[in-house]
Amino acid sequence: TGVQADVAVYFPDNISKLYQLTQWLPVFENHPNDLTFAIVIRNIHTFNFLQGKTSLPLAHVPNFSDVMNLYRVSPFKAVVYVNNGVANFQSLTVPELAHIHINHGESDKVCMVSNQAKAYDRVFVAGEAAVQRHRAALSEFNVDLLVRVGRPQLDEHPSPSISESSRTTV
């Protein structure tokens, strides 16, 4: 059966990379527009770990054929990617959907400006510095595909991960 959402957030990786997704969950859960999101997970351990940790629907699709079937029967209009995992390229085979790379942060690391950016319909970046990094590092890359969005996950105000204490934190 399909998942009722406008946007699929594709995450094929194991729990060790879950930080790449979890920083975006509040943004997807509290999206200011009427867009709805669902998390598409390939790894069963990641799927089990996320149960009850998000209000978004979760879909476990372990195999390529499962991913293709989910995309076929769901009303998704776009797929969002939070990293450059090699398994993203299986999801990218669906031409009817818009494929958007949002990454999990920005830095001067090579992976922030790899040729993988050319595979996506749009690449969301924090700002002009990211645009300049792409322009300088990639040949034959259309910087018009870069969309400046800031860092929306920083607009969320998560609860502190450490309990309140009278002790000084350094």
Positions of predicted regions on the chain:
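Short active-site oxyanion
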Residues: 33-37, 77, 118-123
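A nucleotide-sugar donor-handling region in carbohydrate enzymes
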Residues: 116-170
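Extended catalytic core of nucleotide-activated donor transferases of GT-like folds
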Residues: 45-116
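A short, charged/proline- and glycine-enriched loop
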Residues: 2-7, 95-97, 164-170
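Helix N-cap/beta->alpha junction signal
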Residues: 13-14, 43, 83-85, 126-129, ...
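Short N-terminal or domain-adjacent regulatory/targeting segments
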Residues: 1-5, 12-15, 104, 149-159
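Short, conserved loop/helix-junction motifs that constitute active-site signature segments
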Residues: 28-31, 90-96, 114-119, 140-141, ...
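N-terminal pre-catalytic "stem/leader" segment of glycosyltransferase-like enzymes
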Residues: 1-71
